[in-house]
From Swiss-Prot:
One of its GO terms (biological process) is photosynthesis. P700 is a chlorophyll a/chlorophyll a' dimer, A0 is one or more chlorophyll a, A1 is one or both phylloquinones and FX is a shared 4Fe-4S iron-sulfur center. Chlorophyll a B1 binds at H654. It comes from Oenothera elata subsp. hookeri. It comes from the Eukaryota. Chlorophyll a B3 binds at M662, Y670. Its EC number is 1.97.1.12. Belongs to the PsaA/PsaB family. This is Photosystem I P700 chlorophyll a apoprotein A2. [4Fe-4S] cluster binds at C559, C568. It is a multi-pass membrane protein. The gene is psaB. It is found in: Plastid, Chloroplast thylakoid membrane. Its main location: plastid. One of its GO terms (molecular function) is oxidoreductase activity.
Amino acid sequence: MALRFPRFSQGLAQDPTTRRIWFGIATAHDFESHDDITEERLYQNIFASHFGQLAIIFLWTSGNLFHVAWQGNFEAWVQDPLHVRPIAHAIWDPHFGQPAVEAFTRGGALGPVNIAYSGVYQWWYTIGLRTNEDLYTGALFLLFLSAISLIAGWLHLQPKWKPSVSWFKNAESRLNHHLSGLFGVSSLAWTGHLVHVAIPGSRGESVRWNNFLDVLPHPEGLGPLFTGQWNLYAQNPDSSSHLFGTSQGSGTAILTLLGGFHPQTQSLWLTDMAHHHLAIAFLFLIAGHMYRTNFGIGHSIKDLLEAHTPPGGRLGRGHKGLYDTINNSIHFQLGLALASLGVITSLVAQHMYSLPAYAFIAQDFTTQAALYTHHQYIAGFIMTGAFAHGAIFFIRDYNPEQNEDNVLARMLDHKEAIISHLSWASLFLGFHTLGLYVHNDVMLAFGTPEKQILIEPIFAQWIQSAHGKTSYGFDVLLSSTNSPAFNAGRSIWLPGWLNAINENSNSLFLTIGPGDFLVHHAIALGLHTTTLILVKGALDARGSKLMPDKKDFGYSFPCDGPGRGGTCDISAWDAFYLAVFWMLNTIGWVTFYWHWKHITLWQGNVSQFNESSTYLMGWLRDYLWLNSSQLINGYNPFGMNSLSVWAWMFLFGHLVWATGFMFLISWRGYWQELIETLAWAHERTPLANLIRWRDKPVALSIVQARLVGLAHFSVGYIFTYAAFLIASTSGKFG
């Protein structure tokens, strides 16, 4: 018999039902479970797939550059970034009638095009790209890197080039190389690019391959570096009247500490950012020499962890045994990496709008909204993934003997206390926040808005004041003109910071009130509940009160019958599954809050948010309903407009989302009967019954149906909100 899919599992390949296909797809990337897998092959497969991942990323980014160069309007946009709409790529659609062609022909294009809301134009402009030729060059370079990555992935699977397991488990060397090489050297290289190409570009001087050896980035050259007069590099910065991309009002400084924003572009000063990257490079180059390898300098991580025994013995054996536990568990390492990456991605969302790094991006409101929402959603998925792999670690890799009485074992020992505290915090936040919202709703419904319970966020306002925001009148630290910090700030460090924080034209430290207080606690409820479900799922992965022996059942078991009191919904997978709904729910509140507050800020009617956000009906009516009006007007006598595609996507997103419930709220027997009936009808229908299949059709398993339902729910939810966000923002601000 010919080899059938999946080749990696002979047991599955011989399954006579359609289960073979679905289980094959589900376990394709679970290398650990494949036939004949060895530890060595496992590490090598993962290593090779990393190169494949890099190849895909480089190909994708190359495509972005290529399509903008080919079909975009980058050169026109560079001439007038605030009024020309950046084009992502052309739309080729033979079904377009004349009204559609007219609706989507914009940005100075000759035919229908898509507008770019990704911020790439602003990014490329800031780092010194100016012409389509520059974009093509970049696209070709990335294509080359993509090919190199593919070759490297293939090469490291060949017998002669296969790394050994000991190479993969050499944690010190890997950390040193990643810290110094990946972060240190690349940050230094980026500083070099900013100083040699981007900063001259922002001052109207084009530096390319043909002249970069002739153009001095600073009039003093390397002199100040070698004579220790580093302050010369900070003297004569760009003035506040500097026109970005021209020499008008420009200075000669390359590494500054100005603080605040460039008045024209509303983005951070390029010279501040170069300085920042140089500092990061310096720190990481040192950090990359921290761990002991064959050079005999630095620390051994194992020694560090073994020595880390808490004083007084109240926390057991501290970190003993952790080195081998982490170093031998890919899931533990992946969990740590995902947790870090998730937090960083969320921080990127927060900082991209409050401290915009790219020229003119702060005035492109739709792009700001899209980037914030995009990064928050990505962060949510990555963070839930961290806990999923933490749970798999406990099931597959955790060895109680190796970790006796250390911090990991003690987490498991008092997991009831951890889970109950999280549960209490979630209940407290939920009931109090909902209670306030509902009370306020009732007061408005009865026509007595003055009876609302409105709480000023005084602690948060005090923190904002301490950082220099004067409007609350707290007169403390940086907002007090008498404090030494305030006076030092005027001259020594970041003189532009205090101006920026008190200007109302940016998103730094927005003024907050009772509406913010309430939604902040709603978001806190979502975060704590999501965390509760994820933490409980991981800590109970090996066993819980009801089912003390989950280890051999694995990560994703469905129900183990009524024998143990009914074991439905208690696998680690079920916890992950439930947590994703809460994660999406929480990010919904986060993005609604961000978007509504910013829409009112940009439109200059902040009072709408302040007055309507204190009760639920306000959110439903003045944010969701009011802003979706353009998406739900259906067909009208005016024909098509450029928001029509978003209206369609809004509808389609709802459809996909609702389809999720078909899989989430139904029992397996129902599907099996439906399938049997359809198969019966097929076999008895002339012509149709000429088509036969080898596998007996069976319904999805409980876990699979939940996964399919969750996927539709998530994708539909995100599609719906993406269409709403982009249409409601671009419809108002063009």
